[in-house]
Amino acid sequence: MFAICDSGWVPVYLRWIYGIDRKQYCGPMIFKDLVAQGKHRMIFMGTNQKTLDSLQKELAKMNPDVMGMTFYELPFKTVDEFDYPAIAKMIEEDNADIVWVALGAPKQDFFMSLLKPHLKRGVMIGVGAAFNFYSGMGEKRAPEWVTRMHLEFIYRIMQSPKKQLKRCWGIVTSLPVMLYQEWRRKNKK
């Protein structure tokens, strides 16, 4: 098993609690690196067809092979309403090594966990807003100085307050308790 420090704060918490030094490697960074490598067959799922079409054109500048890959718009549904066996069959027939899922957190996480039992191969990676960032349609990632200061969440709240405030509130209200519990568990050893 491996874990990737997606949040800018995860490396900070690892350092505070365990003294472990890790760098952030978030979804958009992983996405760009793996697409540019050109070593894997990929399928891109989520968002809307307009964004997917623009994304395909932009990614082809990094990796021309992307033009022959599948970009699939997932219909707007709750996670319980998807036809997971049919989606898995499409992925299997595509022979994708990597399945990129952009439905936003936490929906994409639930989607992937429900799809996983139907897949025989490949790796699924939830990348949230990465499709929007790389589609060239206007949505940008926070400036580098903002991410270095671990304040990207504030930038994202300002970009789409209704969506992000709800998401961030859940994290802000549960994270201190989880961190304290982990700190206590670690110090009992």
Predicted regions and their residues:
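Proline-aspartate-enriched helix->loop->beta-strand connector
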Residues: 91, 95-100, 105, 121
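Short glycine-rich anion-binding loops that position phosphate/pyrophosphate groups of nucleotides
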Residues: 9, 103-108, 130-131
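Short, flexible loop segments at boundaries between secondary-structure elements
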Residues: 74-79, 120-159
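A short beta-strand/loop micro-motif in the catalytic core of glycosyltransferases
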Residues: 2-6, 46
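A transmembrane-helix-recognition feature enriched in membrane-embedded lipid enzymes
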Residues: 12, 141-189
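Conserved beta-alpha
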Residues: 11-90, 94
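Short Gly/Thr/Asp-enriched flexible loops that form oxyanion-binding sites at enzyme active sites
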Residues: 56, 109-118
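Structural motif
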Residues: 2, 41, 97-98, 123
